[in-house]
Amino acid sequence: NNFSTNYNHSVDMASIAGSTESQRSIVNNWEFGDELKVNYRLNDNYEFTFHTGGKYYLINSERVGFEKIKASDYNIGLNAQIVLPWELQLTTDITMFARRGYQQTEMNTTDWIWNVQLARTFLKGHLTAKLQGFDLLQQLSNTRYVINSQGRTESWNNSIPRYVMLSLAWKFNINPKKK
C-alpha cells in the first residue's frame, strides 16, 4: 500500500475573455493518491499480481470563469507469469485505466490495455528470444490530456501505440585478464 498527498499553490497571470488586461490567477491544487499490489506465487511456474491505484484531484480558484475540478484517475489490473512447456515463459498484463469527473468529455475515458510477452532462452541462457505484443486491444490513444496547476493543457505524443515485436538478445561476459 502506498498513500500519497500533494498540495500546490500556483500563482500566475491570466487573460480573461473580454478584457485587455491580465489578471492574477491563484489556483490551489490538492492531489491524493493510493496504490495497492497483492502478489500470489503458487510455485516457480505460476505467479499472479493484482494491482490497483488511483488519484483524486481537487483544484479550485477564485478566478473569474474558473470551474472547480473534482476529478479522479484510477486503474485496476492483473499480471500473470506462467512457465509453459518447452521452457516458454508467458507474461501477460491487462489493466483498465479510467478518468472521471472532468468537465471536458474527451478527458473522461476508459481504456483497457493488454500486453503479452512470450520468451525462451537458448544456449545455456546466453540467447533470449522474445515475442512481445503491446496494446493488443488497440485502445491506447496518441493524445494525452494533462491538467496543470493553472487549468487544462493538451499535449500530443508522437508514438506507436500498439505493436508486435520479435527480439533476440545475446548475453556475454567479458572477464578482465589477470595481471
What are these regions (language model features)?
Residues 1-179:
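Exposed, low-structure sequence patches enriched in small/polar residues
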